[in-house]
């Protein structure tokens, strides 16, 4: 698996060292073991996990800036993209948030096993923890989950003014077009769209770079359940 992972990293032009490689493969080992008794991901084959979780998450690596010091991954699941990015960026602090206890228990295990001092795991919801963390983060992360107009309402309030949100999406959806109202209300705008291909399957991936231009009204995010039922 090591050679396969190295080849993938080289194809997507992400640099690595032996420490990052060792921790990533340990993460893979823990995930495979945990997933055998607790369903964290439907992808179960080693090479598929490396490409569709690890390398897919690391498509963000070259979009991160030196000045990006605090990042939040909302709905992180089994830790993608936040945990693998934390392994590759020990100088940056990552908050991994998920409301499902079995997932955050797993993430705590990974954090402790890999001695990742730059990772904070929180079991909870964005609407519950925003009070103490409003406009505290440089970068917001989220892979796939929810419609863009919904996840914008969760993510943008956490970002500092001039902070960026880097959602990962599938190419060919109407989500961008349908998110114009949410972007306006939350004082944010799309800077750029990046199209990538996964290194082995050649599957298309999209990363959207969104800038927070001004403070967000403190009534956002709305109470639990409302963003999903009544998107902006």
Swiss-Prot record:
Any idea where this protein resides? Cytoplasm
The principal location of this protein is: cytoplasm
Query: Which keywords fit this entry according to its UniProt record?
Result: Cytoplasm, Methyltransferase, rRNA processing, S-adenosyl-L-methionine, Transferase
Question: Which residues does the record give as S-adenosyl-L-methionine binding sites?
Answer: 75, 80, 126-127, 143
Q: What is its EC number?
A: 2.1.1.-
Q: Which InterPro entries match?
A: rRNA_ssu_MeTfrase_G, SAM-dependent_MTases_sf
User: What GO MF terms are annotated?
Assistant: rRNA (guanine-N7-)-methyltransferase activity
Is S-adenosyl-L-methionine one of the keywords?
yes
Source domain of life: Bacteria
Per the record, GO CC terms?
cytosol
Instruction: Name the family the entry cites.
Output: Belongs to the methyltransferase superfamily. RNA methyltransferase RsmG family.
Q: What does this protein do?
A: Specifically methylates the N7 position of a guanine in 16S rRNA.
Q: What is this protein called?
A: Ribosomal RNA small subunit methyltransferase G
**What is the originating organism of this protein?**
Fusobacterium nucleatum subsp. nucleatum (strain ATCC 25586 / DSM 15643 / BCRC 10681 / CIP 101130 / JCM 8532 / KCTC 2640 / LMG 13131 / VPI 4355)
Encoding gene (name): rsmG
